């Protein structure tokens, strides 16, 4: 299992969704930018907290996937199933090891990282993946970059920084208590 020795980690992320340039355009078009922090713990727990441009928090507590949107004052709760397994955070930190779901193909060095191409394995739920291809950028034995190409041509670029591994995370880290008056949607 890739990153087998990493039981938990926390750090910061920046994320961009871009569209490749159309004919006549010189640069890719940035569709969306965000940044925030992440925490994960195996098996199956993570927090992906967006702080900019707006506050949102995605929490996988091992059983459920919770999406907290501060601006909407809304918490959506759903079982941790297919929706979780296809998220970028779950690809890196999920219950199923990245090398069990993807064939890892050496891709060379780019941007100070050693890249591995991610090719979904046909027998590991590739049909459930919204990504046609991707890559993970490694530095010092840790994933620090992720590039995912979806079936519509959009590219998601994620950079991880200030990573701390195997720290002493308390059990309360993955518990979320919504503020009073929040709308709660339970989706089955």
Task: Indicate residue ranges for each PLM-predicted region.
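Short Pro/Gly-enriched beta-strand edge/turn motifs at strand-loop
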Residues: 18-22, 86-88, 115-119
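Structural motif
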Residues: 44-45, 64, 140-145
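Acidic/charged, solvent-exposed loop-and-adjacent secondary-structure segments enriched in E/D, K/R, S/T
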Residues: 67-93
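Gly/Pro-enriched, hydrophobic low-complexity segments
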Residues: 76, 97-188
């Amino acid at each position: 299992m890739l990153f087998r020795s990493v039981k938990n980690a926390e750090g910061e992320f920046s994320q961009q969704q871009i569209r490749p340039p159309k004919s006549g355009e010189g640069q890719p078009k940035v569709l969306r930018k965000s940044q925030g922090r992440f925490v994960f713990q195996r098996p199956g727990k993570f927090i992906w907290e967006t702080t900019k441009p707006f506050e949102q928090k995605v929490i996988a507590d091992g059983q459920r996937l919770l999406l907290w949107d501060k601006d909407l004052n809304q918490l959506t709760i759903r079982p941790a199933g297919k929706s979780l397994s296809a998220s970028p955070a779950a690809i890196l930190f999920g219950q199923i090891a990245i090398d069990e779901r993807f064939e890892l193909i050496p891709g060379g060095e780019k941007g100070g990282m050693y890249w591995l191409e991610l090719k979904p394995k046909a027998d590991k739920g590739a049909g459930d993946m919204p990504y046609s291809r991707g890559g993970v950028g490694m530095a010092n034995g840790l994933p620090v970059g992720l590039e995912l190409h979806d079936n519509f041509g959009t590219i998601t670029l994620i950079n991880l920084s200030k990573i701390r591994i195997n720290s002493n995370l308390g059990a309360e880290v993955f518990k979320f208590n919504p503020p009073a008056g929040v709308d709660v949607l339970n989706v089955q």
